[in-house]
Amino acid sequence: MFELISAINPEDVSTYDNNLFVTIDIDWAHDTILSNTIDILEKKDIKVTWFVTHDTPLLKRLRNNSNFELGIHPNFNFLLQGDFKYGGTDSEVIDHFLKIVPGAKSVRSHSLTQSSRLSSLFSLKGLTHESNMFIPEYSKMDVKPFKHVSGMTICPYIWGDYLDFSLSCNKSNFKETVLLSGLKIFNFPPIHIYLNTDSIEMFEST
């Protein structure tokens, strides 16, 4: 029932239609917070795709769990603001994060930064699956993965906890959401798991 992003094949409905995909944007979480999330998901014994933002000794623990796969979570925001913290070009930024996760197959950019050029660069660097598109479950669309002209498999996600508790309306009925047909990718940053965030006000006051 739970599967990894890299297992999605747009030409084979059975690889996604009856599966749930849990993804974690690590988002530079402190090791205490990240370890808490790993503990919870290891106890659940489910498959999880982790989008990595930084090096930490905990990556070894993640790599040693066959239920987990590591993707990259490149941050292009600094580059867009003229700051070369992670590299002076989009290609260098991707390389920076691939040095942390060599051989990564999946990618989701911080802030969902995306373009046809980036998709082509991802593909050229050996990445295969991109989850930079958000189509909320309340849109009632039958979400499906698809092949981009670059060769990347585009895997939209339908639910993110921060997005959900930020909404004043269209709150998700989670029990109904997991029963939807089509592609069901969920996004959980560790900080919100650690805090058990239930509102934007709670998060901002922490």
Indicate where each model-derived feature is located:
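Substrate-binding cleft of extracellular glycoside hydrolase catalytic domains
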Residues: N65-V93
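Terminal accessory/targeting
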Residues: M1-N67, N77, D95, K99-G103, ...
